[in-house]
């Protein structure tokens, strides 16, 4: 647990390494880590949303981040070597902020005691809050078993009390929504529930949140997209255009991010019934996350859309940290997800930049692939996400092939006390083999790989029987490498310093040869610029 304890200590007072706002207005957001409030207490928020409301005490607008606190989030943060198969609702927690990075300690605004007074606990999740000026009420919409629960408060700071539950059967044909979030139009202040069909999630809907018969309800329902099953349903607005966004139905695991867009919130959305894969999410499945919610920052210099991904690590075991926040870029009207480990945001101007400690390797902990690869079921694949495998000698990688080597390994509980998550890179075969696994890292329009010196690291363990295990990085015609020449049946670190990157391109990888039956695991690969 030493590695995880050190990481937690570094991130005690925010979403990044700084304990207080920086003088230039840029504050760091570090993904792949557990987050902490300004007093050092954990942030357990999952499946929620950020909204801009007036502080009841000062009248000043602030950011209000609501999310569900599950008991398992506490347990997993304390010991990420155990994945949980049940979720137990503790509360909806509220954190507030003025810069989207430094957040106040959690305040439970909807408690399990309040829920228990009106029914069984069961599933509660996927929630958001809307302000209804006609009633001077804040309405919290949350999935509750087979219904949509509505709780209300006269203050954005709660407490929220049970108001009623909505059976969606006469509206969409199922009593529940598939997934849902609350979206508030930044130009009109009107809020909407963005959600999917309760069975199969193959239809997406928009409903305005308003008052009906004296209480908050869902009005003006419209089906705006159908076809493939999609969950994590949410929305953002950019340059007057609405983007309906969703993830694949992979349970708790990360997935590709999909979208359609329209000039009106009720559509028509294009391409019609054909959600497109968002650029930038393909090589690590949206930074090993699902679509959670978005927030558009109207800065003084630029408008930045914040992708707030849910990593359900407590239930998927797919890494560290429950929230993965990253900025979007746009090529015209086409959104691009910038998958970053560490970056800095200026909330006032809307500007952002890559942080000096960013890890440029994508899917470096090999958690994007939720099952064994090669995989014969959805998503059918014969390679690791973000990585290329070259078979130099040995059995070829074949889906459903009886002799095909497996490319990833299911980490044991003992493994997970040292390395990240349920999966690692795996080298083994039934016959003598030689294999190379590589990833090419290249500058993009928004995320440059600056020329200069870098350090490459990884964790490795292996059985006897290997001719060589080489970790390497290549750039500008130069090769930098390190070899393992002794047996390491326990995890050990690999490190290459002084990797010189030229022309904004680098290839990192591993070259391994071994006897039949020899096994090697590699995990937590990084390429970070030297400071």
Outline where the language-model segments fall.
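Carbohydrate-active catalytic/glycan-binding domains of CAZyme proteins
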Residues: 20-374, 416-419, 490-493, 531
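Sec-dependent signal peptide recognition
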Residues: 2-7
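Extracellular and organelle-lumenal recognition/adhesion modules and their flexible linkers in secreted
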Residues: 353-531
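Alpha-helix initiation/capping motif
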Residues: 8, 210, 270-271, 442-444
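Hydrophobic h-region of N-terminal signal peptides that target proteins for export
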Residues: 9-18
């Amino acid at each position: 647990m030493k590695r995880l304890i050190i990481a937690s200590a570094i991130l005690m007072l925010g979403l990044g390494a700084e304990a207080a706002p920086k003088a230039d207005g840029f504050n760091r957001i570090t993904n792949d880590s557990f987050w902490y409030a300004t007093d050092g207490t954990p942030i357990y928020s999952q499946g929620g949303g950020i909204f801009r409301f007036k502080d009841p005490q000062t009248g000043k607008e602030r950011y209000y981040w609501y999310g569900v606190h599950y008991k398992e989030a506490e347990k997993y943060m304390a010991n990420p070597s155990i994945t949980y198969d049940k979720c137990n609702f503790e509360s909806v927690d509220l954190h507030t902020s003025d810069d989207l990075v430094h957040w106040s300690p959690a305040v439970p605004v909807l408690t399990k005691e309040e829920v228990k007074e009106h029914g069984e606990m069961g599933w509660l999740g996927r929630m958001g809050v809307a302000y209804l000026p006609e009633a001077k009420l804040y309405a919290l919409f949350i999935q509750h078993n087979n219904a949509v629960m509505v709780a209300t408060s006269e203050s954005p700071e709660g407490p929220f009390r049970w108001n009623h539950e909505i059976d969606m059967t006469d509206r969409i044909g199922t009593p529940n929504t598939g997934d849902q979030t609350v979206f508030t139009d930044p130009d009109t202040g009107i809020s909407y529930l963005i959600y999917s069909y309760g069975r199969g999630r193959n239809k997406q809907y928009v409903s305005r949140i308003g008052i009906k018969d004296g209480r908050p309800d869902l009005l003006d329902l419209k089906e705006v997209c159908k076809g493939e099953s999609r969950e994590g349903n949410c929305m953002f607005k950019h340059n007057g255009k609405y983007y309906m966004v969703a993830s694949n139905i992979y349970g708790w695991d990360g997935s590709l991010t999909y979208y359609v867009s329209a000039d009106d919130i009720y559509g028509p959305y294009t391409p019609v019934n054909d959600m497109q894969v968002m650029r930038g999410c393909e090589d690590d499945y949206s930074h090993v996350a699902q679509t959670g919610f978005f927030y558009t920052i109207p800065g003084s210099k630029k408008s930045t859309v914040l992708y707030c991904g849910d990593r359900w690590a407590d239930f998927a075991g797919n890494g560290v940290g429950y929230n993965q926040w990253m900025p979007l870029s746009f090529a015209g009207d086409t959104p691009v997800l910038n998958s970053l480990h560490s970056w800095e945001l200026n909330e006032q101007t809307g500007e952002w930049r890559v942080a000096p400690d960013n890890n440029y390797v994508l899917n470096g902990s090999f958690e994007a692939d939720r099952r064994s690869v090669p995989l014969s079921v959805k998503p059918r694949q014969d390679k690791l996400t973000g990585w290329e495998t070259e078979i130099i000698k040995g059995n070829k990688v074949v889906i459903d092939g009886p002799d095909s080597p497996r490319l990833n390994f299911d980490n044991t509980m003992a493994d997970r006390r040292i390395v990240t998550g349920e999966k690692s890179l795996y080298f083994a075969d039934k016959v003598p083999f030689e294999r190379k696994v590589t990833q090419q890292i290249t500058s993009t329009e928004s995320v440059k790989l600056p020329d200069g010196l870098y350090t490459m690291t990884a964790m490795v363990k292996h059985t006897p029987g290997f001719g060589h295990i080489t970790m390497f990085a290549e750039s500008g015609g130069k090769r930098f490498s390190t070899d393992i020449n002794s047996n390491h049946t326990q995890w050990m670190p690999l490190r290459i310093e002084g990797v010189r990157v030229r022309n904004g391109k680098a290839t990192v990888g591993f070259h391994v040869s071994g006897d039949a039956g020899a096994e090697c695991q590699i995990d937590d690969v990084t390429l970070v610029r030297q400071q």
